[in-house]
Amino acid sequence: MAARLCCQLDPARDVLCLRPVSAESCGRPVSGSLGDLSSPSPSAVPAVHGAHLSLRGLPVCAFSSAGPCALRFTSARRMETTVNAHQILPKVLHKRTLGLSAMSTTDLEAYFKDCLFKDWEELGEEIRLKVFVLGGCRHKLVCAPAPCNFFTSA
């Protein structure tokens, strides 16, 4: 199960700030650095941290100080074109879910910037706010028979 999140770029810190889209979305944002997409160790992920938010579908690593293990940076509005244009990303994230080596952090950063930030710039949107899908890491394993089924529409 996936959770709907708001994602806003903080240019001062070069991070994407995530917050849940829910009745309790006034809580503090969860930040995940674009430069650090590696999975934190299980000991670095407190089981109760962030539990007060009462959000179903969020993996425990979403509340880790190291940030979530794997973010599916694909907006629901652009999911079809993004996935179809770049078939490699679903496969990469599926491999990350299984704990396999897939793609370098630099390549992932380039994908995010090319496919997402370019959309914001081309559309002329001043406020970089989108709804994204979070999930699919080793803390909440999502099994999929084929990479094309790895993404869950919001």
From Swiss-Prot:
Residues 68-117 are annotated as: Mitochondrial targeting sequence. It is found in: Host cytoplasm; Host nucleus; Host mitochondrion. May form homodimer. May interact with host CEBPA, CFLAR, CREB1, DDB1, E4F1, HBXIP, HSPD1/HSP60, NFKBIA, POLR2E and SMAD4. Interacts with host SMC5-SMC6 complex and induces its degradation. Interacts with host TRPC4AP; leading to prevent ubiquitination of TRPC4AP. Interacts with host PLSCR1; this interaction promotes ubiquitination and degradation of HBx and impairs HBx-mediated cell proliferation. Belongs to the orthohepadnavirus protein X family. GO terms for biological process: DNA-templated transcription; symbiont-mediated activation of host NF-kappaB cascade; symbiont-mediated arrest of host cell cycle during G2/M transition; viral genome replication. Keywords: Activation of host NF-kappa-B by virus, Activator, Apoptosis, Host cytoplasm, Host G2/M cell cycle arrest by virus, Host mitochondrion, Host nucleus, Host-virus interaction, Modulation of host cell cycle by virus, Transcription, Transcription regulation. This is Protein X. It comes from the Viruses. Multifunctional protein that plays a role in silencing host antiviral defenses and promoting viral transcription. Does not seem to be essential for HBV infection. May be directly involved in development of cirrhosis and liver cancer (hepatocellular carcinoma). Most of cytosolic activities involve modulation of cytosolic calcium. The effect on apoptosis is controversial depending on the cell types in which the studies have been conducted. May induce apoptosis by localizing in mitochondria and causing loss of mitochondrial membrane potential. It comes from Hepatitis B virus genotype E (isolate Chimpanzee/Ch195/1999) (HBV-E). HAMAP family: HBV_X (MF_04074). InterPro entries: Transactivation_prot_X (IPR000236).
